[in-house]
Amino acid sequence: IVSGSAVSLLFGGANCMMMQFRGRLFLVGDLSALRTAVNVAGTYSLDISAAFVLAALLSLVGCLLAISLGGKPDLGKKERLVTRGAALACAGIYTMAVFYGGIFETNGIRLTWNENDFEESPVLYFVESIRSMNVDQPEGYSKEALAAISAESALPVGGKKPHVIAIMNEAFSDLRRIGDFETNVEITPFIDGLTENTVRGAVYSSVFGGSTANSEFELLTGMTMAFIPKGAAPYQSYIKYEKDSLVSVLEAQGYTSAALHPYDASGWNREAVYDCFGFDEVRFIDEFQNKRYLRGYVTDESNFENLIGRYEARNEGERLFLFNITMQNHGSYKSESYESTVSISGHEGEFPQAEQYLSLLRETDKAVNELI
């Protein structure tokens, strides 16, 4: 009873946190992201519901009663063997059906999020996520098939080798694409005005509310999260050895590669992954110069100054591939020490998190202006 109550309470708490911060249930893949979650936990605030407090109190009362009543059931050796044998048999049947028999898929049940999951089947949802962690080879996959696709889409190779600077701006998005609203000031006037010598468009993200490294994985490898189990983090689960990527492709053409990220090296196992990708240089927060902070994160302006510094320090004739992951706009958006500069017209102060987020994007726009 005691151990069962503890496990149930921890599982329930994990689901409550995931619902608040990610808008979905707790999956087995989230266990591998625990260290990353701890790194950024200080910027989030958890709203503990009365229902969770009540559940914790009831669990505590149940444990105390179980301990005080104590004692073991008066069963003979034969009864104990039968009971344990039956329990093992049930566990074995359940394990075979769920993990090896694909009972959910056989009956047309897919592991997809819907609003009823939280109320009806969080445990089933978690258990099925364990089975789905094994990645199956897609149908029709082969080196020959890849070569054929490559031949069809091949573009003529030019003689120029420009410097390549790829910046993935943390949590940056255009909310105007999903809602019609006006603000007291323009949010991203410089970025919106980029037209000359510019190719632009919308990019759909495979993640929402977290799992930044999954978008990073897609960019650097050209692979898609469509074939990765829901809730999994490739950086922590699948990249364990040297892997072809944009890094290796450019290095084969004579480029020097460098990854810059103004945060801890432990986040999403980046230090080990960048080594597998073969980056020539890797810089995390300890190696950034003249750091300035906003809500506890290095500002984009300060980040870009370090990026410019590495570019200007290049050797004569050296071609660079600089890969930069920013941190300024990371959640949460409840900082009381930050005064928002953007307000939603007609709804001033009604959506403080949205206004703080939009204000941060405005700061990014200014930094991009200085960078370019």
Q: For each predicted feature, which ranges?
A:
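Short secondary-structure junctions and interdomain/linker hinges
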Residues: 17, 44-48, 64, 71-72, ...
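Alpha-helix initiation and N-capping motif
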Residues: 31-34, 119-126, 188, 213-216, ...
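Solvent-exposed soluble domains appended to multi-pass membrane proteins
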Residues: 150-160, 166-169, 174-372
